[in-house]
Amino acid sequence: MSKLFWAMLSFITRLPVPRRWSQGLDFEHYSRGIITFPLIGLLLGAISGLVFMVLQAWCGAPLAALFSVLVLALMTGEFHLDGLADTCDGVFSARSRDRMLEIMRDSRLGTHGGLALIFVVLAKILVLSELALRGEPILASLAAACAVSRGTAALLMYRHRYAREEGLGNVFIGKIDGRQTCVTLGLAAIFAAVLLLGMHGVAAMVVTMVAIFILGQLLKRTLDGQTGDTLGAAIELGELVFLLALL
C-alpha cells in the first residue's frame, strides 16, 4: 500500500518522491491507487493551508489566500487547472464530439478556458478570504476540500468509459469497481468529518458529490465518456464547490 501511495503522489503531483519508493509497481495496477487520492488531497490541502496561516499574520487574508492557491496549483504542476481549461474550451465550443476532443487536445488556450481559469482561481481566493473573515479554520477547510475533491473524482471513473483511444486518464476511467469507489468516498467523508467537526464538513461533501455527479453525467452526454482533462476539471470544481458549501 505504501508503494502505491508514493506512486500516486508522484503521478498526480509535482512533489519530489524518490523513484525507489514506488519501484516495481506496474503502470497497469495504478487504478488501485484511487483509494489514496483523498489522502494525497489531504496532504496538498494541509501544505496550502499552512502557507495561508504563515502569511495571514504578515500580509492579511486576501494575499495569504492568493499565495495558498498559487502553492496548491504549483504542487500539482497546474495539471488540474490545465484540464479545466481544456474541458471548457472543448465543451463550450458547441462543435461535434470528435471536434470537441480535438480542441481539448490542443495545447493553445482558448477564450472559454481562459475565462474558466480566471473564474475558478479568483473564486477560490475570494472564498478563502471570506472564510478567514468568518473565523473558519482555513487549514482544516483546505485539507478537507482537497481530500473531498479528489475523492469525489471517483464518480467520473466508476461506470464511465474513456472518451479517447489513449491517454493518461485511461488508467482510472472505467477501471475502478464499486468497492474501490465506496472506500475512496468513505475516506474522503471521514477526513471531512474529522477536520470540520459536526456535520458541516459532511454536508459540504454531500453538496460536492451531487455537483460532481451531475457534472459527470453532463460530460458523459456531451463527450460520450470522460478524459483526463475532465477529471482535472472535476477536481478543481470540486475544491471550489466544497469551499463554497462551507460559507
From Swiss-Prot:
The protein's GO terms of the molecular function aspect are:
adenosylcobinamide-GDP ribazoletransferase activity; cobalamin 5'-phosphate synthase activity
Q: In which pathway does it act?
A: Cofactor biosynthesis; adenosylcobalamin biosynthesis; adenosylcobalamin from cob(II)yrinate a,c-diamide: step 7/7
Q: Which GO terms describe its cellular component?
A: plasma membrane
State the Pfam families in the record: CobS
- Supply the InterPro entries for this chain: CobS
The alphabetized UniProt keywords are: Cell inner membrane, Cell membrane, Cobalamin biosynthesis, Magnesium, Membrane, Transferase, Transmembrane, Transmembrane helix
Output the superkingdom of the source species. Answer: Bacteria
Catalytic activity, as annotated = alpha-ribazole + adenosylcob(III)inamide-GDP = adenosylcob(III)alamin + GMP + H(+); alpha-ribazole 5'-phosphate + adenosylcob(III)inamide-GDP = adenosylcob(III)alamin 5'-phosphate + GMP + H(+)
Q: Where in the cell is it found?
A: Cell inner membrane
Q: What does the similarity note say? A: Belongs to the CobS family.
Primary subcellular site in the record, as a coarse category: membrane
What GO biological process, any one, is recorded here? cobalamin biosynthetic process
Role summary:
Joins adenosylcobinamide-GDP and alpha-ribazole to generate adenosylcobalamin (Ado-cobalamin). Also synthesizes adenosylcobalamin 5'-phosphate from adenosylcobinamide-GDP and alpha-ribazole 5'-phosphate.
| Keyword Oxidoreductase part of the UniProt annotation | no
Q: What class of enzyme is it?
A: transferase
Q: In the UniProt record, does the keyword Mitochondrion occur?
A: no
**What is the name attached to this protein's record?**
Adenosylcobinamide-GDP ribazoletransferase
